[in-house]
């Protein structure tokens, strides 16, 4: 059973035959595993929380500063991703660029060690964190495009799912190691304590080392194919070329452009599930701080395993069906959590963990969808547009979450309306689902050159 398809589209970069065995695929997926500490430890659970603590000023001041920094870095990613991706395509140096960006990400992560718990270090922390976010996103563009070197149309779903699942598992493993070895004990490994926040700062050094070491297998299996580099072009000309490529893609494979729009919507909803899950856990379902961390750990394990399993279905059912199944399930479970919000912790543990099982599969299937249809030689550029479209609408989930809470609180005069934010996230997911339904899977022609 496969997705309903449109007439044949442009030649895809994927080759007809698999590009090596599972050892090669594992090497590729180690980038997901190795780079994940930046997302899990630095931007979500540890450093961002540290940076918004009272050590750096009032909570309102630090939280606002972090929000502004995040917005600026997101805007820069939206502007730079397609152009830098196009540059990788034109130069044929996508793997080289990925290697340099990964090393820079490791250095920026380790440099967070120098952010001491004093107000004067807030700007340094924001600059390093923002720069790391930009580098991480741009590196992901080149990494996603490199899937053509290890996958074929027959296994791209399970390869993408395996990589995404490795990211979940690697991120949560390093988080747990750091928590139990350095952060939780009064005196941790090597005598590390919380004096001067040295436990947090040493954790940043470990993250940098983790990124550097565990991504090495990726660069052992990926190679830049010999290619005559295209002529150098200026910044303005680069954006003109991106626009010309988008128009050409619109003419050749219009439903791929539709998919970029649909995925931008539902990917923002998927991000909202994890972004506001911890907020709801503590505020509505009254989980303690320790319970939230435990829930986050279990949720990432569930998401990682589920993503790998759904990758197998991707190659059988097609990526669009996997995404549809995931989105329908997420909306339904979200509505159930809303209705049963008075049920306490058991409701959140049961339905919340079930919900996380469908987030990763939708993300991984989105990557495999594009990998199947991207025209040959345009992987970096199209995955750059994929990053850009996601950034353009990244305000929707936070806005919908907050708007539902604010309106209901205003109408009812009650303060305990946080759970209404669940409907905001469900609405964004449902909007992405509605836009995705009419999208057809372009039947791209398979490339014939060796990978």
Model-predicted segments: where are they?
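Juxtamembrane intracellular "pre-TM" segments in multi-pass secondary transporters
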Residues: 9-26, 223-261
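Short amphipathic helix-loop junctions that connect adjacent transmembrane helices
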Residues: 42-63, 275-292
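A membrane-interface helix-boundary motif in multi-pass transporters
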Residues: 59-61, 182-209, 403-429
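Helix-to-loop junctions at the C-terminal end of transmembrane segments
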Residues: 79-93, 306-319, 405
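Cytoplasmic membrane-interface "Motif A"-like loop-to-helix N-cap segments
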Residues: 88-103, 315-329
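C-terminal ends and interior cores of transmembrane alpha-helices
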Residues: 102-119, 328-342
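Multi-pass alpha-helical transporter architecture, strongest
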Residues: 210-221, 423-451
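C-terminal transmembrane helical hairpin of 12-TM major facilitator-type secondary transporters
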Residues: 320-364
């Amino acid at each position: 059973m496969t997705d309903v398809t449109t007439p044949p589209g442009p030649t895809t970069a994927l080759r007809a035959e698999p590009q090596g065995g599972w050892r090669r695929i594992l090497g590729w997926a180690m980038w997901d595993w190795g780079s994940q500490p930046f997302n899990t430890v630095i931007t979500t659970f540890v450093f961002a929380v540290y940076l918004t603590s009272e050590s750096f000023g009032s909570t309102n001041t630090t939280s606002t500063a972090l929000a502004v920094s995040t917005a600026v870095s997101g805007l820069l990613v939206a502007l730079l991703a397609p152009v830098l991706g196009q540059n990788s395509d034109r130069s044929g140096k996508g793997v080289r660029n990925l290697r340099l960006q990964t090393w820079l990400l490791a250095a920026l992560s380790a440099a967070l060690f120098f952010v001491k718990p004093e107000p004067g270090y807030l700007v340094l922390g924001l600059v390093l964190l923002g720069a790391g976010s930009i580098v991480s996103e741009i590196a992901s563009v080149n990494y996603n495009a490199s899937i053509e070197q290890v996958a074929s149309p027959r296994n791209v779903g399970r390869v993408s799912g395996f990589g995404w699942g490795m990211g979940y598992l690697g991120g949560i493993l390093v988080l747990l190691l750091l928590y139990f070895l350095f952060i939780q004990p009064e005196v941790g490994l090597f005598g590390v304590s919380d004096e001067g926040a040295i436990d947090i700062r040493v954790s940043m050094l470990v993250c940098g080392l983790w990124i550097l070491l565990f991504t090495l297998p990726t660069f052992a299996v990926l190679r830049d194919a010999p290619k005559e580099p295209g002529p150098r072009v200026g910044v303005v000309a680069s954006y003109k070329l991106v626009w010309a490529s988008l128009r050409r893609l619109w003419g050749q494979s219009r439903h791929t452009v539709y998919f970029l729009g649909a995925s931008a919507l539902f990917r923002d909803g998927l991000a909202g599930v994890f972004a506001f899950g911890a907020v709801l856990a503590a505020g509505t379902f009254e989980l303690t701080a320790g319970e939230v961390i435990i829930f986050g750990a279990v949720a990432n394990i569930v998401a990682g395993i589920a993503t790998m399993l759904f990758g197998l279905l991707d190659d059988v059912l097609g990526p669009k069906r996997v995404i549809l199944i995931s989105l329908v399930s997420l909306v339904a479970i979200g509505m159930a959590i809303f209705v049963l919000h008075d049920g306490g912790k058991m409701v959140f543990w049961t339905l919340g963990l079930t919900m996380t099982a469908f987030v990763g599969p939708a993300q991984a299937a989105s990557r495999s969808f594009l990998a199947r249809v991207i025209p040959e030689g345009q992987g970096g550029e199209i995955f750059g547009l994929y990053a850009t479209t996601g950034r353009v609408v990244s305000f929707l989930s936070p806005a919908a979450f907050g708007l539902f809470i604010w309106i209901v609180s205003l109408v009812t005069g009650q303060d305990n309306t946080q759970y209404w934010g669940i409907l905001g996230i469900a609405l964004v997911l449902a909007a992405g689902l509605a836009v995705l339904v009419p999208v057809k899977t372009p039947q791209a022609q398979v490339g014939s050159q060796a990978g």
